[in-house]
Amino acid sequence: LGNGLNESYLNTDSIQLASTLRLSDQSIVIADSRLGQLYPDIFPAIVNSRILFLPAAEHTKTLKSCRRIYDFLSSNNVNRSDDVHVVGGGVICDLASYAVATFKRGCRLILYPSTLLAMVDAAVGGKCGMNYRGIKNHIGTFYPAEKIIIYSAFLNTLKPQDIRQGTAEMLKSYLICDRLSQIHPGDLPQSSIILEYARFKMEICTADPHDLGLRRILNFGHTFG
């Protein structure tokens, strides 16, 4: 959706990724605070006031955190034509995408998913939102990113549990569509296979962008779970 997956940044190194984030000294970045510690070479050239780090925890997906993003965007005079770069896993992608979608009726959103689950699922398809009154994703909308840039080296610092979560989601897609390459749960897939699975979800979401028909097949296993 949007301009879709950006293959030119598949398997890119941190220097290339950093230069992408440093399109200018006006770049606006919202990122997982853990990534700031794990990949210090990616972020330093951006003026600190134009980076907002947030903890990647489910309790972050709240109105309070969303207001914090609004304040950050407002204080940096972000306009609808500005790119907002979001770097993180599902929590950060969900929350920041919702804030970007609703700030001034929507700015240009560029996602850099940092977990396997986000690369093949959370960052793809445009769903975004936050938790409310204890209900997960109770407030949300559809807002496809202009670009989704997959930096596969992020996977090198994932915990085994994070890999399992991602491969479990990929296995669900494989059960839905057996033309996809076979994967082995718990093993880190090759970058080309990650891209293949992300494209599969994008095809479904492009055909049914607002989850009214075909896209519901992606809920396979979720309701039972």
PLM region spans:
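ATP/NTP phosphate-donor binding region
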Residues: 1-83
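Residue-level signal for inorganic ion chemistry
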Residues: 29, 62, 113, 151, ...
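Glycine-rich beta-strand-to-loop/alpha-helix junction loops that act as flexible
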Residues: 56-57, 87-89, 220-221
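Structural motif
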Residues: 86-87, 112
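Short active-site segment of divalent metal-dependent hydrolases/proteases
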Residues: 92-93, 97, 225
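A glycine/threonine-rich phosphate-anchoring loop and its flanking beta-alpha core
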Residues: 98-184
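Active-site segments that bind and position negatively charged phosphate/pyrophosphate groups
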Residues: 184-225
